[in-house]
């Protein structure tokens, strides 16, 4: 990763860190690198519902067209839908304007290659170098060689049809509350679940440009937990701002996280003989309970760094097709090239229908060890992470767990945060440990 590109593209406060001028340059550089040798020089652009999306889209489109590349606009669309549409429309690349689960002030730009996969570090570095060099060497075509813009009117229909084709079950009889996070899935998610026969109660599906992720979605599932109980629904589904993740809620209003969803789906695939290489890829944030549950079934667990790009790398390296994160970023490579919250939900719903078991019972396949996570906002992540004082404190606190837990302190790849996670048998002890480490981080910063 370079200066601009983090674990999930370029992110920052819109109109400050991520200005229209920067978006224009990223568009020019991205078009030159990704589409210059393409016989079909067009790029798909989608976005979430943030107020800054129109501004950044206009700048990005101008940059791409100024490099002689056409633009296919798909409007408000989930990130994984853009990955799919890039392949479906045979474009040279796809671009998403979104900051996922981040607050409305932020926005971001991330690319997909022609195959629908996120870019490698090397390709991102090439784009970044061009931007830093003011796009030197990128041509300025004139006349008929300037890029054109076309609105893809049936983009949502194409994705809904594709998503439904991955399920293979009738969802009739299921009542589902769907939290759309006032984000990119506010239209397509309810359509998909309804089309397959479910009774859908959508909430947080009225975006106004500033309410994305505001007290809703997968990072704030409390309202969904209440709604599932009050609606007497079978379960709830919570997407985030760009719908590349999903968490679930059982009929009793209890949260079912990405680890539990992965255990449910992995065991189902394993029993059907469909779990490629009998392997699941997870990150260091996954609960120890996941490891125990999968190993009990004879399933190999491969662990990697936080970030769905790293999960994808390990999937490809290990010949595996399924993996994800506790946060609900889950990849089914048999269906899509990136984490897809709607497709993940459909796989979970398929297991519920096929087994006839409620989500509560299925989630009980995994016993979660107590885990505590706290985010600390810092000015200098590198200063904190390189501090010998912090390293000594972590080592000291780990000794207190006596081998029956772990501590993980890591910087966020997309926000000015350091995340402190402790896992063990006693929540009271974990609170004390995390509290002490948080105080040390604040003192260092």
Curated annotation (Swiss-Prot):
InterPro entries associated with the record: A-D-PHexomutase_a/b/a-I, A-D-PHexomutase_a/b/a-I/II/III, A-D-PHexomutase_a/b/a-II, A-D-PHexomutase_a/b/a-III, A-D-PHexomutase_C, A-D-PHexomutase_C_sf, A-D-PHexomutase_CS, Alpha-D-phosphohexomutase_SF
Provenance organism: Pelotomaculum thermopropionicum (strain DSM 13744 / JCM 10971 / SI)
Pfam annotation, one family: PGM_PMM_II
Protein's name in the database: Phosphoglucosamine mutase
Enzyme class: isomerase
The organism's place on the tree of life at top rank: Bacteria
Phosphoserine modified-residue sites: 100
Function text: Catalyzes the conversion of glucosamine-6-phosphate to glucosamine-1-phosphate.
Biological process annotations from GO: carbohydrate metabolic process; peptidoglycan biosynthetic process; UDP-N-acetylglucosamine biosynthetic process
